[in-house]
Amino acid sequence: MQDRGDKPERRSRKGRRPRRRICFFCVDKIETVDYKEVGKLRKYITERGKILPRRVSGCCAKHQRQLTNAIKRARHVALLPFTVNE
């Protein structure tokens, strides 16, 4: 049997949880995310060209889905790169 003392205990962080980020698109009352607005889309892509997850971007579920589709569409029409050239 394994002894439970193998792993160090995780310490819980004391204090408040970090405040949830508010969706940028909901604040500006933007209904749909347009694939042609490359400047806005670039904020939600990493340096490596990956789409930021919802917990990092702070978007709501509805706008995160629209954002993902808009980024993929912009990549297909060559407005955004698929990957970064090194």
Curated annotation (Swiss-Prot):
Give the UniProt entry's GO cellular component terms.
cytosolic small ribosomal subunit
UniProt key word Heme: no
Q: Which domain of life is it from?
A: Bacteria
Show the GO MF annotations: small ribosomal subunit rRNA binding; structural constituent of ribosome
Keywords from UniProt, A to Z, are: Ribonucleoprotein, Ribosomal protein, RNA-binding, rRNA-binding
One Gene Ontology term from the biological process aspect of the record: translation
Xref: InterPro entries: Ribosomal_bS18, Ribosomal_bS18_CS, Ribosomal_bS18_sf
Q: Does the keyword Transmembrane apply?
A: no
| NCBIfam families xref list | S18
| Known partners and oligomeric status | Part of the 30S ribosomal subunit. Forms a tight heterodimer with protein bS6.
PANTHER family given in the database record: 30S RIBOSOMAL PROTEIN S18, SMALL RIBOSOMAL SUBUNIT PROTEIN BS18M
Give the similarity note.
Belongs to the bacterial ribosomal protein bS18 family.
HAMAP family recorded: Ribosomal_bS18
Function as written in the Swiss-Prot or TrEMBL entry: Binds as a heterodimer with protein bS6 to the central domain of the 16S rRNA, where it helps stabilize the platform of the 30S subunit.
Name the record gives this protein: Small ribosomal subunit protein bS18
Taxonomic classification, please?
Answer: Bacteria, Bacillati, Bacillota, Clostridia, Eubacteriales
**Gene expressing this chain:** rpsR
